[in-house]
Amino acid sequence: MRKAIFLRLAMALALLLTVNVNVMGDTLRKGGSIVGKIESNGDVRLNGSIVGRFESNGDIRVGGSIEGRIEKNGDIRKRGSIIGRVESNNDIRINGSIVGRVEKNGDIRYNGSIIGRAEQMTDVRRVAVMYFFGFFNL
């Protein structure tokens, strides 16, 4: 009897943990519509399919291959070359010029205009990679 109750509680706890993992993460919107999600484990989903992953060491994987890297100082690399930077104030630079910004409230600005939004934003650099650096077709 006690074993059965324990197993039921363990299964309920496992189910709750699974639901929480799937709920957490950055929901990405463009033009008001949900277009993707960065899950808490780093998986990148576009239109429901996993298309890549942000590794904890900064590597950016697209379709299983390492395509780039997010450096600790904010530099964004693609195939080894620096292609841009996420500044500490959340400005986005490409080729040295400021082209956009990730606002603290999650709004994504490109040349001053809001082009999207990241809800429950957990990592500004990952969000910037999704909208500005072309690793994923967002």
Question: Where does each model-flagged region fall?
Answer:
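Long terminal segments
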Residues: 2-45, 49-51, 56-57, 65-67, ...
